[in-house]
Structures are given as structure tokens and as C-alpha cells.
Amino acid sequence: PTPPEATAAGLALARRAALAVRDPESVQFHPPALDSALDPRPLLTEALRGEGAHLLDGAGRRFMLDVHDDGELAPRDVVARQIWKQRRHGPVHLDARMIGPAFPERFPTVWAIAQRAGLDPRVDLLPVSPAQHFHMGGVATDAEGRTSLPGLRACGEAASTGLHGANRLASNSLLEGLVFGARIAAELGDLAPPTTAVADTTVPATALDVDLDRRHTADPAIDELRAVMWDRVGVVRHADGLRAAREEIDRLAPALASHPTGRNLLAAAGLVTGAALGREESRGSHHRVDHATADPAPDHTVISHPDPVAVPLPTGAPVQQGSPA
């Protein structure tokens, strides 16, 4: 799962520096995460479904067979949406019991997760839910990792390189980090060193507008923000819910403005929500129930000032949907 330390700092810093941010509404949700008291929800590898594990509704029926020819092996966004919809009517479980006694050896990570939750996947059904997994959007870069600020590079999940389109394939983020990291390092290594020395600078503590003593403390307002984003800006989106989310984000802003983590989360939440409201279509991981089809002339969302701006793509550079994961 996404580590707890990943709290959108890169995206928030870019926003405050007025860097161009691209497609922040493109947030991928992993279909099966263990629905338990563990936080964040641990992801259950797709290899389980590859080994034959089934998704079951409350009546024990394999509902994915009614939705897609590939059943549980359908693309991530399709499976995540169906789990989301089914959970409105009752629990959804992953049945991996057919893997049998070899489960601890075959899937040691999942075994350890299940044990922490008090479950034995050899005999128990695993309660599941979608979970936020990867951000295809981020700081806009070119193919060499250059951002809109001269001299600044970005790579990894903080960047929007365009590599993943609107629906990332499994494991491609690792390849992206390796390739773009190497490209950035190679280019920076070729740059001439500065001809003048940079003087040491001391920044007074009063220059910081955050309360550093709060950086490791839990905050009820952060929990509220997480709930708002999950309920209103999650797997399935609608204009009414997105507008309500913007109001809630504004309401929570005073409580989180001086929180080192909270202010980053606020910035990211505002970017994702505003861009999701502006994209009146469904594309890849971004699904609007009030705009359920894809726009035949897609635009990227590019934000470089307080309000999202849809910038038409140049001819020959279509937004890519992605393929089954």
C-alpha cells in the first residue's frame, strides 16, 4: 500500500510554487484491499485472482462474471467500480481458499496481513474494498523530467510524465521511476557547475508558517478530510458530491492550514476535486456517473493558477485510456 509518509508533499510544494500540475483527477484505485481495522488498508495482490481467487457478493455469487468477459481479471478500474457498487448492498469477499495449504509459502505478504487482521485465507473469506493506490496526475513534466520551472526536475509518483495515460498498468510505476530517474541524472550530470558560489542561508524559525510540533500528531480534521475525499471524490464521482467536497475542504482549511501534513493534504484535495469537477467525462480511473462516457476530443487538465484550466492536446497526442492490468 501507499506508505503513511506519502502525504502529497511533492504535489503541494509544486502547487505553492505555481508549477504546472497535470491531470490531478486521475487517481487509481486498487480493486481488492483488505477491509479491516488496519490503516491504511493493505492491498491484496492481483496475483491472487490470477491464481483463481474469486470475488463474491453477499449471496456468494461471482458478480464480476455478469460485468466483464474476463471476470475478476478485468481492468483495475472496472473491478474497483464493481466492488464499490456491490458494497452499497452488502459485503464483498475474496475467496482464495482454493490455494489451500500452500498459501503461506505462495503469498507470504498476504498471509502476514491476514494474520494481523485475525484471518486465515486458507479457510476464511477475505472482506475487501477498493483502496486509493496510485496518482497518475502530478507535476507536469516532459520526457526528460523537466517541469515548468527551469532547472527543476520531477519523477516518480509526484510527476505526471504522461506515461500512464488515465489508467496505469500494474508495475509500470517502477519502470517509470527507473527510466526517468536515470534520464534526469544523466542530464543533470552533463550540466555545467555553477560559476558562482551560493552563500549559506539561515532561515529563521519565524519564517515557517506551520506548527512543526504537530507534524507527527493525529488530527481529527485530517480524518474528516480523508472521509470527504473517499465518500465524494472516490471510485465513483458525481458533480453534486464534488461540489459538496469543495465546500468541506474549504470548511476544514482553517483547522489544517498550520498543520505540516494537513496543509499538503488540503492542497492535493483541492487539486483533485477541482479537476474532477472540471472533467465532465469518464476516462480510465476517473468515473463520473453523471458523465459516463468518454469525450471524443479529450483534453489534459493543466493547472498553473488557482482555477483548473483544460488545455487542448496538440494534434497527434491523444490521452491514453490504458489497458487491462
Predicted segments with their positions:
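Conserved structured core elements
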Residues: 4-8, 77, 104, 145-146, ...
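Glycine- and aromatic-enriched mobile tails/lids
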Residues: 56, 61-64, 72, 82-83, ...
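Alpha-helix capping and helix-loop boundary segments enriched in small/acidic/polar residues
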Residues: 1-5, 39-43, 47, 168-175
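Short, solvent-exposed loop/turn segments at the edges of secondary structure
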Residues: 8, 48-51, 134
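Thiamine diphosphate
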Residues: 2-15, 21
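FAD/FMN-dependent oxidoreductases across multiple families
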Residues: 109-153
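An anion/pyrophosphate-binding glycine-rich loop and adjacent beta-alpha core
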Residues: 13, 19-126, 187-193
